[in-house]
Amino acid sequence: MPAPPEFLSWVDASKDAFIARLSHAVSIPSISGDPAYRPRVQEMSDWLNSELKKVGVETKQVDLGNHVMDGQTLPLPNAILGKIGNDKNKKTVLIYGHFDVQPAALSDGWASEPFVLTTLPDGRLVGRGSSDDKGPVLGWLAVLQWHHETQTPLPVNLRFCFEGMEENGSEGLDELVESEREGWFGGVDCMCISDNYWLNTRTPALTYGLRGLVYFKINVSGPGRDLHSGVFGRTVHEPMTDLISLLSRLVDAQGRILVPGVDDMVSAAGVEERSIYEKLDYSIADVEGAAGGQ
């Protein structure tokens, strides 16, 4: 469904206001991985909650409790749940995003102050969180603002889940999702994660699938004391070489997973999906550029 022309005109006319709002968001150093900045993460939660209410979203800030970091017991920043629309004839879409950021300083190689939104000569805006993930979150806010100001009905019901710990392991999120599965998340038909990347800097991209993560822990035991390799080498098993042998059986030199049955669990790309790939604005040069290749 294409965007209404009047919406696009409104976006153009509201450009300065959007940039000012993003500039304010970027100026809040909501660094979740540094205890000293925990109050600023909560400040970001409070500000975003207020902005959502202004455009008609019913919100709830959720106390996620405390956690221990660097030997300190700290309060987790409040997550924000939001809802707008409850039409049983419409689909319900859950929007996820986060308002915390990674640390940033000029000494890290930034050409400008990271927490000051800066306009480059080519028109691009640079600032910590401008793309990951405050910019995308504020994009939703802009859409809601237009619908609110023009009283244009939304085509779907929306639910929101915005957190302030994504850059630090999303502590508290699992418990929140479980506790609200029949509450704020009840009746959700699909989900949009507003925290992803374009394939390049030229063409907007919609990501419709993500790889999952599986973590395993293995302990390899060896001799009960430090042994001299000149005496015990090749006589007693060395834990390091045993571990190397084990890990070498998981993948081959091309990165193919060697665990039996794993590939059988992956759905094959259909004709329609392959046709989408063939039309993507994506090339080997894009891969090399993103990886820092020469």
Predicted regions and their residues:
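Short small-residue beta-strand/loop micro-motif enriched in glycine and branched aliphatics
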Residues: 125-127, 224-230
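Flexible glycine-/small-residue-enriched beta->alpha junction loops
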Residues: 113-114, 207-219
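Acidic-enriched catalytic cores of C-N bond-cleaving enzymes acting on peptides and small amides
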Residues: 183, 199, 208, 215, ...
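Acidic/His- and Gly-rich active-site-bordering loop/insert found
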Residues: 1-130, 149-154
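Predominant activation on well-ordered alpha-helical scaffold segments within soluble catalytic domains
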Residues: 49, 138-145, 174, 240-248
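Acidic/histidine-rich catalytic neighborhood of metal-dependent amide-processing enzymes
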Residues: 124-125, 129-209
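Generic secondary-structure signature for well-ordered alpha-helical cores
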Residues: 27, 53, 149-152, 181-182, ...
